[in-house]
């Protein structure tokens, strides 16, 4: 309910966000076996070698608004903890409650205080993560411009950095495609999570011989998609995250029309 309430995702998508967080935790259970070191007898005359894998310390996770459960509690936190580290999460500005609620569940499950820590702050205040000597690494998901800044700044301070940034996905549709199934897939990829995800599909390149047929099928399915609030479980798509983002979407649509695009829906 927390994901749907603060993010606006349709109910099924919100459930999927949480389930993916659980899957990430299950996968992290196998991490300790990957942490085993290696030994080599008689590497050279009179010498044996032994290697150990040890925790680095404190990591910082900078979370996006679009997957407030899956990314911090499925991708970032479980592996970090399983490898013996602790983490400080910068909660997403627009969706902080879900992250906090899952941290409460970790505590209820017996996780010691101080292993997961959550802060709410602006992006400018979060700059301290990039230079603080106690932070050994950064994991980030978000925009490309911010990701490049985080990568360059944190790396220059000797930190390990993961930065998953924006994507520009394309679909290539050939004339032997099953039209209905392809149209359904494009609808799901384009409108899922109101398009607010890195797996969203903004471009489809279609073989000319089937272009009109596919467009008609997509329009028909899009018209049937119910837009509504997340608490209505029959809603197929919820709102975008805020008014500013809505304006951005409208501006891109208008720009496309100005440049010759035909609006079919």
State the predicted function of each range:
Residues 1-47, 241:
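N-terminal Rossmann-like NAD(P)+-binding subdomain of aldehyde/semialdehyde dehydrogenases
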Residues 4-5, 16, 131, 152, ...:
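Phosphate-coordinating loops and pocket residues in cytosolic domains that bind phosphorylated ligands
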Residues 6, 10-13, 17, 91-94, ...:
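Catalytic cores of large soluble enzymes that bind and process phosphate-bearing ligands
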Residues 31-38, 108, 188, 192, ...:
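Conserved helix-loop functional segments at active or binding sites
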Residues 37-181:
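Rossmann-like NAD(P) dinucleotide-binding subdomain of oxidoreductase/dehydrogenase enzymes
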Residues 145-265:
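ALDH superfamily catalytic-core signature
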